Amino acid sequence: GPPKVAPGKXISASFGGEWL
């Protein structure tokens, strides 16, 4: 999916949605 901002993590990987 598109890049997301997770609380306390910042921008995630676009293909995972999780901080990598």
Curated annotation (Swiss-Prot):
Belongs to the expansin family. Expansin B subfamily. May aid fertilization by loosening the cell wall of the stigma and style, thereby facilitating penetration of the pollen tube. Acts selectively on grass cell walls, which are relatively poor in pectins and xyloglucans and rich in glucuronoarabinoxylans and (1-3),(1-4)-beta-D-glucans, when compared with cell walls of other angiosperms, including other monocots. It is found in: Secreted, Cell wall; Membrane. It comes from the Eukaryota. One of its GO terms (cellular component) is extracellular region. GO terms for biological process: cell wall organization. Keywords: Allergen, Cell wall, Cell wall biogenesis/degradation, Membrane, Secreted. Residues 1-20 are annotated as: Disordered. Its main location: secreted. It is a peripheral membrane protein. This is Expansin-B.
